Amino acid sequence: MTTAYRSLSPEALRREYAEVSARFDALRELGLALNMARGKPGKAQLDAVSDILTILHDPVQCQADGMDVRNYGQLSGLPSAKKLFAELLGCRAEECFIGGSASLTLMYDTIAKAYTHGLLHSEAPWSRLDKVKWLCPAPGYDRHFKITESFGVEMITVPMTPTGPDMDLVETLVRDPAVKGMWCVPKYSNPDGIVYSAETVRRIAALKPAAPDFLLMWDNAYCVHEFEGPFVPFDDILTLCREAGNPDMVFEYASTSKITLPGAGISVMAASTANLAYMEKLMDIQMISYDKVNQL
């Protein structure tokens, strides 16, 4: 069907509806059970790494980093897990907080705490503000947008370009003190697979937002992946922000979901040590520790 429906007569529309309905019914009769979820590894990929399920088989192996990982404690995660993610992201181990299987949980927690308590440099919890705005490079990841939408944030669309978000527009929009943050997937951005250019990354790190608690949510989910050609690492966004005079502006997230087992991996929230100290005080009330056995 190449003709616009609005140009068809009522009779032609009825015929078209009957034809489409017949094709739809034929597909239903096939009884297909298709999982159309995007980003979900196949069984072959899961099987390739399933040996990790039997790595730990003796309680003696649960002694690591001077502690028994089966017990309570070590809210921010095992030092060895922090070191692993620091190597993957290019940041420092002390800038890493280790979470559970979903980095999305850490992202949600970050926004939630901004609303209930405010961030390190917030003048008030966001829930007390008249208006909270957020920059959403689009097209983008729907689960990111659902988080900010669920808090009633006014989301502002920023068009994507072949090199990342339209930075001229971003630099203009952040002059509004009500603009509190921006979602970013710097590598293989959903759904177009755009990779931010080095210039775009530097301009983002050098932003001068009017809001003192502007929050750059940097979802580096594909930090170790490369579709073609040699692996090209990104400059560490934490270092770039620090060098640009914005040490506390960014929270970076990643996980092993696309590396090992999505349902049983570990995640990381990387930020300045000042940011992590502030967040850990809030999270200490919420929990004692994530799954350290899995981290091991």
Model features per residue range: what roles?
Residues 99, 238-296:
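Conserved core segment of the aminotransferase class I/II
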Residues 42-45, 188-191, 260:
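Short acidic, S/G/P-rich loop/turn micro-motifs used as interaction or catalytic elements
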Residues 46-50, 147, 227-231, 263-266:
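Short aromatic-enriched loop/helix-cap "lid" or pocket-rim segments at secondary-structure transitions
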Residues 61, 67-212, 223-245:
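Conserved core of the PLP fold type I
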Residues 2-76, 80-81, 86-87:
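N-terminal "arm"/small-domain region of PLP-dependent enzymes with the aminotransferase-like
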Residues 220:
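Walker B catalytic acidic pair
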Residues 133, 215-216, 251:
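Hydrophobic "anchor" residues on beta-strands that sit immediately upstream
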